[in-house]
Amino acid sequence: MNAFHTHPILDFWCFLRRPVAERLSEGMAKKVFILIVVISLNILISMILSLLDIVIEVGGGAVEPVEIDVNPLLSFVGAVLIAPLTEEIVFRLGLAPNLWFLFISLFLASVQYAPKLLGDFFSDNGMFVGFNVLFYLVLSAGICLFFWFRERRGHRYVDFFNRYVGAYYYLGALLFALPHLGNFTYQLPWWLVILPVLPQLFGGLTFGYLRIRLGFWYGVMGHLLHNLLFTLGDVLTYFLGATANFVWLIVLIIVPIVVLMAPFLVERQRQVASRVDAGR
């Protein structure tokens, strides 16, 4: 699968069906092009999935975003500069056959999102936090040491990762989506709780694809671009009003469609030119 399909979306679709831990050997310009096309798809799918909130409300449920009074410029910096890097480290740095990367992702993800243990046992909050940090540090190190000892016995971690890359990929996307449930208040049956974060779930699949197929920093850039485009709407609303946000929404619909269609149009023009040259 190291060979690239004609259209980036076809490559992404094949990867979704059968994830393979193979890095594309394309040049930087081609990789940036793939990134832009895949993020365009992500934007469109995220906007479509966001419409599920309307379906939920029609069905008698309720999903409301948690409102936090934050300066829009600070929110912009956090969403565009800080969140992409930190979230990619936590959720997708470990999507590579590297035990150090696995340790960093395991430790940071567990400290931040895993259940906090023995809360009633410690009266001092500092001791409680310190115990949990130490516990998850030891647990993460233990998992990585297990794979290290297996390597010493001839069972390479790279082979294990390549075999189970699909589990790494899909589990990572799910773990990325679940913490975003805290961004909403909802009244839903337990089996529908995942619906409000389906855009984040698809985002996890998109960023995971970029990380595995292109590299870690391409995943960061894709995440940054995605957050930038969506956060700009909030900033425009704050400074220019709802009309500016509506205009930006139209831009977010039209531009990704054009980007997704461009490779097909270029390929068609190339085929027409080839036929003309052959007929001369």
Residue ranges and their predicted role:
Residues 32, 70, 74, 162-165:
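Membrane-interface helix-boundary signature
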Residues 20, 61-66, 182-183:
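Short, flexible segments with low predicted structural confidence
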Residues 29-57, 83, 91, 100:
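Alpha-helical transmembrane segments of multi-pass membrane proteins
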Residues 57-75:
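Perimembrane loop-to-helix junctions flanking transmembrane segments
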